[in-house]
Amino acid sequence: HVLPGEDPDAAQVLEDVFERRGMTVLRRSRAESAVRTADGVRVTLADGRTVEGSHCLMAVGSVPNTEDLGLDGAGVRTSASGHVEVDLVSRTSARGVYAAGDCTGVLLLASVAAMQGRIAMWHALGAAVAPLDLRTVSSNVFTDPEIGSVGYTQADVDAGRVNAEVVTLPLATNARAKMQGITDGFVKVICRRGTRIVIGGVVVAPHASELIFGLALAVEQRLTVDQVAAT
């Protein structure tokens, strides 16, 4: 699938949309190299196939720029990838030194960086702080349609890491979506068996980055499915 780190059902929706719009999706393919040609670029895949075009967009993520900061001399431990290692209150291995943001490699989101920074500030000032809890942090992929997710995932349920039920509602069954002619997307809710407390969810829809807020609040406040449905 595209977006291998996201919910597989969400990735499938995007693949279907991409192909319907005329895009060719090469599944289970990895790029080995890219070279400039006389009139464009040629990408060679791991299986030997080649793809040619006018341009190649390199969407390979980012790497931390920590190599020349003298962190080793200060006693700040980094990982093999160069990320600064921190605990859940943003402390590094050096006493009195904190780190926050993408350089830590902890869920590379602006909102998480802000949380880490606030936690580091208050902890440095001696205040009692709650450690960073990524299970209540929502993340978004700004594709069309968008993907919003929070908490435990379908993969967690399938692997038995959490005893939960998963309910998926197609967006096409929603009255507003019908009126707007929107057929691609869904809302997936993950809740614990027995207590029915919401512990995760996925939204694939236009403006999913805004719609996920309701599920994120339910996860953070440990609301049950019935409590959410009654609002």
Region locations from a protein language model:
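Flexible, glycine-rich terminal cap/loop adjacent to redox cofactors
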Residues: 125-126, 137, 142-231
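Conserved beta-strand segments of alpha/beta enzyme cores
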Residues: 24-25, 50, 77, 163-165
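Rossmann-like dinucleotide-binding cores of NAD(P)H-dependent redox enzymes
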Residues: 1-38, 42, 107-114, 122-156
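Glycine/Thr-rich phosphate-binding loops of Rossmann-like dinucleotide-binding domains
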Residues: 3, 65-68, 80, 107, ...
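FAD-site-proximal beta/loop scaffold in flavoenzymes
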Residues: 50-126
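Conserved beta-strand-loop-beta-strand element in the redox core of flavoprotein oxidoreductases
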Residues: 35-50, 56
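Short loop/edge segments at beta-strand edges and connector loops
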Residues: 27-29, 80, 168
